């Protein structure tokens, strides 16, 4: 019998499974909705879909480069234990290879792309969820490019808890590029240089520092000078080039870069779970939630 789009839509809403999985299940069960749900459950696909309301705030970052292209990605899981699972690591590598080869514009586009095995990225992740038993999400990625006279710097901290990918122009010294990536991982600057800081943000900080100085009872005639000094400290906290180099605090990052006749084109820093609010549950609630399932 012919399967209608409405049937597929209804099954997707009931199970959260992918469109092609739903269509296939309905075809195999002659359009019987209940049997199709059972079939999806038997295959572990509906089970995976039911995990969609959970918060995936663990996981790992990964960086891969190929010639003049590089990718950094973050994939989330629910527990740190799964993030160390070989199956999860294989998934990370497979996704990295796909993103590097196909350079989708964003996660939404990536999820709909076909992979070498014929499935979409979304279907591939769903099948991995069924095997691993936790919600897994491709949270974000960035593909960077460089030219032959530039260098990628890749650094993973704590096995991928933090990942940084940098591009240095004017040098092919990957060791220096990696050192800068390590610095970014440790210090977490927000900008490359102070000229990237908006006038609005600078003025806002200046206003706060001025009020701080006045509250301290400093004479007005020296407040302006104090504020500019403190503003320099502010820039050192947020701007990469102004920071003391983590491997040698006697040097500024800009001095390390200048010694190689290089400039920082860009950097991307991912920290697993940043910005995701992890649900806090007590043990009694956790037990009750398991009982209800």
UniProtKB/Swiss-Prot annotation:
PROSITE patterns per the UniProt record, alphabetical: EF_TS_1, EF_TS_2
One MF annotation (Gene Ontology) recorded for this entry: translation elongation factor activity
UniProt keyword annotation of Transmembrane present: no
Keyword Cytoplasm: yes
CDD domains recorded: UBA_EF-Ts (cd14275)
GO biological process: translational elongation
Keywords for this protein: Cytoplasm, Elongation factor, Phosphoprotein, Protein biosynthesis
Location of region: Involved in Mg(2+) ion dislocation from EF-Tu: 79-82
One GO term describing the cellular component: cytoplasm
Phosphoserine modification, residue list: 149
Transmembrane region(s): none
Similarity comment: Belongs to the EF-Ts family.
Entry function: Associates with the EF-Tu.GDP complex and induces the exchange of GDP to GTP. It remains bound to the aminoacyl-tRNA.EF-Tu.GTP complex up to the GTP hydrolysis stage on the ribosome.
Protein name as it appears in the record: Elongation factor Ts
Gene transcribed to yield this protein: tsf
């Amino acid at each position: 019998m012919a399967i209608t789009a409405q049937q597929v839509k209804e099954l997707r809403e009931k199970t959260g499974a992918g469109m092609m999985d739903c269509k296939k299940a309905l075809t195999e069960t002659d359009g019987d909705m209940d049997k199709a749900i059972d079939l999806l459950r038997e295959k572990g696909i509906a089970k995976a879909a039911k995990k969609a309301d959970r918060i995936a705030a663990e996981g790992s970052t990964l960086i891969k480069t190929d010639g003049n292209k590089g990718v950094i990605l973050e994939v989330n899981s629910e527990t740190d234990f799964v993030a160390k699972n070989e199956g999860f690591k294989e998934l990370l590598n497979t996704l990295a290879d796909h993103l590097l080869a196909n350079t989708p514009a964003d996660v939404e586009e990536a999820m709909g792309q076909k992979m070498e095995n014929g499935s979409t990225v979304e279907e591939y992740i769903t099948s991995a969820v069924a095997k691993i038993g936790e919600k897994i999400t491709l949270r974000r990625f960035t593909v960077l490019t460089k030219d032959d006279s530039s260098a990628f710097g890749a650094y993973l901290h704590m096995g991928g808890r933090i990942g940084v990918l940098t591009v240095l122009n004017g040098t092919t010294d990957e060791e220096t590029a990696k050192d800068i990536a390590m610095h970014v991982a440790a210090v977490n600057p927000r900008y490359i240089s102070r000229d990237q800081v908006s006038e609005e943000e600078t003025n806002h900080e200046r206003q706060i520092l001025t009020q701080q100085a006045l509250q301290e009872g400093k004479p007005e005639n020296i407040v302006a000078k104090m504020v500019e000094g403190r503003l320099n400290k502010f820039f050192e906290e947020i701007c990469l080039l102004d920071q003391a180099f983590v491997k040698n605090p006697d040097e500024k990052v800009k001095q390390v870069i200048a010694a190689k006749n290089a400039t920082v084109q860009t950097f991307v820093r991912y920290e697993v779970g940043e910005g995701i609010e992890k649900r806090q549950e007590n043990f009694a609630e956790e037990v009750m939630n398991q009982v209800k399932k």
